[in-house]
Amino acid sequence: MRHTGAATIFAIATFGASFLAPRALALDDEHYARARGMIQKSVTWLRAQQDAKTGGWAVAPEGPQYPAITGLVVNGLIMDRAIDADDPAVKRGVEFILSFKQADGGIYDRVLPSYNTAICLSAISRINRPEAAAAVEPAIAFLRSLQWSEQALEGTEETGRIDKDHPFYGGVGYGRHGRPDNSNLGVYVQAMHDAGLSCDDPAFQRALVFLQRTQMDDRVNQMPYAKGSRQGGFIYATAENKDTIGQGQSMAGTVEESLSDGTRASRLRAYGSMTYNGFKTMIYANLSRDDLRVKAAYDWIRRNYTVAENPGLGTDGMYYYFLTMTRALDAFGTPTITPLGAGDAPAQSRDWENDLVARLAELQNEDGSFKSVDDRWMENNPVLITAYALLALQTIVE
């Protein structure tokens, strides 16, 4: 996040008691100017990709539709200082999103109700128009019903009503109480944050319970798959499916780890995008900087700092990683990162915003779109990855 002035004083959305702190500029003038130019090119390209008939983006001729993609684009557009809710592209995009409002309050077509609703809620929460505002509270209520808890909605796949001891507690899945994971929980928490919910809201506090069970550190996580682990980062889920509850799941496989008792064993591997998702949620939930969960996650981030790839997954989900990284570090409020090298020795401090702008500049095409480097999780879709990149850049220069 860029601010003018040599030592701007600003309120950081951070841990523990809220406080005011000075923050030096990390994004220098050269990278700021480059980022602004990249944003304008991306906006121009995305405008040209809007479906003339429906007003949506990445519209599937045969369906089902994914209004979340339009939600990402609209969110990226509306963050621009020169674009408001009356902009024709934004207005039509919002109309497309709201055309998928359901009687239950969700915003989705036939699939992925939690994912689509959450991302669309983040977008419409920024739109100062009565029709958008009217859809916010129903969407919040719908999302609440999908979080695994004592008060969850009875689902069609299996009941979502469980107590706090269940490994699914606090999580959110793709369907109506399908197996929860940190990716869906990440967009859920982002939506609740963007909609203005308090950090004390049960949505955040329940999310912390699920997160703790996916953090690979036995000082905070008592699940058997974390025994002896001191990675500090996050995995994907507490189960691969309903038949493996409590066994954990990582999209990054396993890693040989020196355990806390001095032995070595194979453990589920923490990786970049899920660690930044978890870290961001802890920030939004206002955990203290001294909380062991926060310190362990940030140490993982320092040991694995990179803008070359999604650490642990290579190029899989790389643009999604860039966005989660940007949002998490922006919320954390630090302009630099001091990576930890071998033996946890500090390395040279990095201006992460400059690093990420430079990396995205390498990946942007002349027409303003971004190069696909992988096809996993739909990252061969140029609209999707350009929206991810635009949101990251907008967050940096905001």
Feature locations, PLM:
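Positively charged n-region of N-terminal signal peptides that target proteins for export
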Residues: 1-4
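Bacterial N-terminal signal peptides
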Residues: 7-18
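Sec/Tat signal peptide C-region and signal peptidase I cleavage site
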Residues: 20-26
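An alpha-helical repeat/solenoid feature that recognizes helix-turn-helix modules
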Residues: 26-41, 52, 56-89, 103-141, ...
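Active-site-surrounding "flap" and adjacent substrate/cofactor-binding loops of secreted or lumenal enzymes
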Residues: 70, 94-100
